[in-house]
Amino acid sequence: MSEVKQYEGREYDVIVVGAGHAGSEAALAAARMGNKTLLMTINLDMVAFMPCNPSIGGPAKGIVVREIDALGGEMGRNIDKTYVQMRMLNTGKGPAVRALRAQADKHAYHAEMKKTIEAEPNLTLRQGIVDDLIVEDGVCKGVITNTGARYQAKSVVLTLGTAARGKIIIGELQYSSGPNNSQAALELTKNLTEKYHFDLERFKTGTPPRVDGGTINYDETEEQPGDEVPNHFSFQTPDSKYIELKNQLSCWLTYTNEKTHEIIRENLDRAPMFSGMIEGVGPRYCPSIEDKIVRFADKSRHQLFLEPEGRKTDEWYVQGLSTSMPEEVQQQILHSIKGLEEAEMMRPGYAIEYDVVAPYQLKNTLETKLVKNLYTAGQTNGTSGYEEAAGQGLIAGINAGRRALGKEPLTLKRSDAYIGVMIDDLVTKGTKEPYRLLTSRAEYRLILRHDNADLRLTEVGHNLGLVSDEEYNAFLEKKQDIKDELQRLSEIRIKPSQVQKFLESKGSNGLKDGVLASEFLRRPEVNYSDLLKFIDAPEKDLDRRVIEQVEIETKYAGYIKKAQDRVDRLKRMEEKAIPDRIDYEAINGLATEGRQKLEKIRPTTIAQASRISGVTPADIAILSVYIQQGKIAKIAE
């Protein structure tokens, strides 16, 4: 085969490779900051496509979407335009774990995001496959496509997803493919490891079969409707845009059973996961149905949610039934389940293996340590999930854009955002399996709530140029309204006689002395609307999201203060920087494992070093003293 002749294409400030959820955010962020940006994708019909679950949000993930929105990203706005159902999860629990989840019209989501990208003045969308990078003296200067085009740029972002040497597996069948039977990118990650010496890993994920909604017996399943109370992901979407419950699409709940499990057990010898065909490591928190049956053999049933894929399709997603079993076995499994006895399978489930850049090779900015001006994001970094990908894509795009503009990078700390938690986990601890964000990963989750993402991050987004002045002024007004109402409640006193009957009706003890309105609101049986029965309403008609903040900040004030004190202590450690070129071999007293881990990950602060597995408190003490005593003469020249 003759070699493709190369030619010089246009020059850009930023090039983003891959237009999934990470790439879309990265390209929009870079372009909106004033950079001439090129977004390359294998297939223009796959921009921001949802090859797996047709949903956005959920525990921890929904908070990330709010954070993306507060920073000026697009995912929240896009799902607000294209959802078919909206639900707030964990409403019976505390505010730290509440999260919004939307059922998406996956085709509308893709089309709307593509339209947004095409309308962005500084952004060029182009179909093509990137095979290699242009690297000179360790600096990335652009990309080379399989058609021979050489595009020069000041910085490059790779968001390759599962297309990176992707391989689909269904039973005994396996073939090279990206997600949803799209084309795989075969050369780029091969060059990353062979030419640029990146350490790659092989991960696996999977997807369930899709069934024809017209063949589901819904009478045998349990309806899961959306919420009546308005909620959106974007802080800019008004309640008036909320879809009435009667116009939302329901999901439906069913279960596997002993017959299902028997079919799976009888065919385990044909399951690629157990036959040795699958080499990649799969996600712990989203196992295949065959893996569940083996790992949780004592369970008599597993939940399955039947989810619509959109308003203009009859395809339904069977959440919880991810599998790579042979096609005919998948049909048997489906027909053993209540409500799916006559279901027609429209697409079989499959497993897909793909390449991952081991994330210890990244900085907190998502720039690679091996090649300057090269950034990576999304599943390329070992994460799973659209939301995790979009969060990383936004940060990578911001930092690639700021590098092109000659500005300092943005880094989010663990105490700033779930996005900061995720990136710190990846670059500090690495991951040996597809990484999923969980509320339990965030030690400051009471501060990192879905309801206060704008209060945490809008200022940052505005400073970056991603949040408009109009949006910022609306945010400042909301912030002032919260402050004013909290102050007002701290100045109003309530007499015991005013609330005696109310407290008796709640089965609560009465007051002996008068209390401030803020103290009365702190009681668990009292909400803001109850409080207004005993005091004057504020002069201004407050938005419900202002009232929500007033309630949360009042009721959880003590816990929030304790969490903030811990954050302040962490910040002092974060301020203790570790010199870039420190020579860990020159530091006497470090344990062998600690020395090896510090050398491999090369943390930038004492706080980050303390979070590395295998680095002991004694190692941290020695390292701190070494830096404090100014023994930097031993830093490698």
Swiss-Prot record:
Residues binding FAD: G18, A19, G20, H21, A22, G23
Keyword Flavoprotein attached: yes
Keywords, alphabetical: Cytoplasm, FAD, Flavoprotein, NAD, tRNA processing
HAMAP family per UniProt: MnmG_GidA
UniProt cross-references to NCBIfam families, sorted A to Z: mnmG_gidA
Family: Belongs to the MnmG family.
Entry function: NAD-binding protein involved in the addition of a carboxymethylaminomethyl (cmnm) group at the wobble position (U34) of certain tRNAs, forming tRNA-cmnm(5)s(2)U34.
Name of the protein in question: tRNA uridine 5-carboxymethylaminomethyl modification enzyme MnmG
Gene: mnmG
